[in-house]
Amino acid sequence: MIYIIGLGPNDSSNIKENIKNLLLNNTSAKIIARTKEHPAIDFLEQNNILFETCDKFYTESDNFENTYNNIASYILEVAEKNDVMYLVPGHPMVAELTTQLLIKNGKNVKVIGGESFLDSCFNAAQFDPVEGFTLADATAPETLSSVNPHNHLLIT
């Protein structure tokens, strides 16, 4: 089983209690974080929770598509022998390509959501997304040609 778990957009104060409990009470799943470069990782370190990261894949690949494909392949390989808790920043279903790859190629995948970075962005910019907004991928600049200039724009 692969559990894709969202750590929220910033420090451990935004990790949901059910997720904290899953991590603290884990006895058998291998914990793999997409990156150590996220403030919520401190929660794992402060609680002596063993984990590894996928940071090496960022230096081994020359583009994000290859990086995320390699991460997903690695998670799927590990999941053949162990349950995996794969930790991602924010919410697993928001701007997280590895989630889509794992859902598409995995057998048993469960998504456990955390707070999305979008919540913080909407709050900081003080607008309601129902007013209209576009979320664009900075690695795919061709998508910017279809942006509605009357909508709020967030480029990730």
Language-model segment annotations:
Residues I2-I5, N10, L22-L24, A29, ...:
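Beta-strand/loop-alpha-helix module characteristic of Rossmann-like adenine-cofactor folds
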Residues K36-P39, G90-P92, E115:
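Short glycine-enriched loops at secondary-structure junctions
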Residues Q46-L50, N105, Q126:
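Short helix-loop-beta junction
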Residues N14-I15, I41-F43, E60-N66, D119-N123, ...:
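Short, charged, surface-exposed secondary-structure boundary motifs
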Residues N63-I75:
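Glycine-rich, highly charged phosphate/nucleotide-binding loops
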Residues L76-A79, T99:
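Ligand-binding beta-strand-loop-alpha-helix segment within the catalytic cores
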Residues M1-Y58:
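Glycine-rich, flexible N-terminal cofactor/catalytic loop recognition
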